[in-house]
Amino acid sequence: MEEELKLFIQVWVSAIISVTYCYYLTPKIKTSLLRLLSVLPVCVLFLIIPIFFSTVHSSFTIAFFLSGLAVPKLILFALEKGPLFPLPPNLPHFVCFACFPIKLQKKPNPENTNHFPKWVFALKVFIFGALLLQAYHYKQFLSTNFLLGLYALHIYLELEISLTLIKFLVSITLGCDLEPQFNEPYLATSLHDFWGHRWNLMVSKILWLAVYNPIRQWRAKSSEWDRFFAIFATFLVSGVAHEILYFYLTREKPTWEVTWFFVLHGFCMAAEVALKRKTKLVQRWPVNPAVSRLLTVGFVFVTGVWLFSPQPIRHGLMERFINEDLFLIDFFNRKLYILLGLFTSL
């Protein structure tokens, strides 16, 4: 564990140095091709380093933050696009915006504004730490379907809690408002609402800038088929990216199940958008929000169990995530008891 922590620190020091190089050198290069070539060594480094970790939390964090987000951000930056362009006002801002899944909130977006009180986040932390993780102690008594539901809840809560805490700390450090990463995805009323406005919003924005927009701008007069293809291609790229993420975590040959999950969702979302744009059925016979939420979340859950979950379950990833979470909680509890003992003895 100590060696893993040392490696984790070394990687982040290397990442900061690499991003600092991009901050000072890349903007001074005039042509897009040379700027792109200047950031490629950093991108290659970020794509390689997740392989050197043994714990799934370390591998996932580095793969998600650096391989999955920092790489496309830097490529877009070299092309004078994306969240790093125009150049942030100083180096700390550039490093944070490049290395963390955050984005400066320039204008409040009503679609992404979370109107829920802060106690809702505290409730999620309680559910995750006090209920969900403890329920795994009794998993031998739980049905397979119930356990799959717990796994889905685990992925969502751990992602939202960790990313919200990072956003909070970076926001305080930089003294600026940041956009939310999640917007209560369980309230989504359609696939477009789920993927476009509620789930992992930083990733959605990067995919929009890196894949969807270039395809739509490729032709001067875009048609509905171009829109359909752009949506489908965006989900296909997301599927391949998740397949690479699974490789980092499992070190096993890809099975492409998770890619088919995103291919299916890309096709369904593209069809949904086309149906809403070309027909007036939705306006004439609107679906009750409660029903549409149930159908949307149900579709995501069922297809997730079918195509998204088999790989992590087959390779024991969820078991490793759970064991590491329980170990970390036990570690911090022991440290807390030691500190409390020191204070009470004074």
Curated annotation (Swiss-Prot):
Instruction: State the source organism's domain of life.
Output: Eukaryota
What Enzyme Commission number does this protein have?
2.3.1.75
Q: Name one Pfam family in it.
A: MBOAT_2
Q: Which UniProt keywords apply?
A: Acyltransferase, Lipid biosynthesis, Lipid metabolism, Membrane, Transferase, Transmembrane, Transmembrane helix
Family membership noted in the UniProt record: Belongs to the wax synthase family.
Any one GO MF annotation of this record: long-chain-alcohol O-fatty-acyltransferase activity
The name this protein carries in UniProt is: Probable long-chain-alcohol O-fatty-acyltransferase 6
InterPro entries, per the entry? Wax_synthase, Wax_synthase_dom, Wax_synthase_Magnoliopsida
Q: Which organism is it from?
A: Arabidopsis thaliana
Q: Does the keyword Acyltransferase apply?
A: yes
Q: Where in the cell is it found?
A: Membrane
Q: What is the lineage of its organism?
A: Eukaryota, Viridiplantae, Streptophyta, Embryophyta, Tracheophyta
Originating gene: AT6
What is one Gene Ontology biological process annotated in the Swiss-Prot or TrEMBL record? lipid metabolic process
User: Cellular component terms, GO, for this chain's entry?
Assistant: membrane; thylakoid
Using the UniProt record, give the first listed, main subcellular location. Answer: membrane
Ranges annotated as spanning the membrane:
7-27, 36-56, 59-79, 116-136, 146-166, 228-248, 255-275, 289-309
Answer yes or no on keyword Membrane: yes
Membrane topology summary: Multi-pass membrane protein
Q: What does this protein do?
A: Catalyzes the final step in the synthesis of long-chain linear esters (waxes).
Reactions catalysed, as given in the entry: a long chain fatty alcohol + a fatty acyl-CoA = a wax ester + CoA
Query: Record's PANTHER family?
Result: LONG-CHAIN-ALCOHOL O-FATTY-ACYLTRANSFERASE 3-RELATED (PTHR31595:SF70)
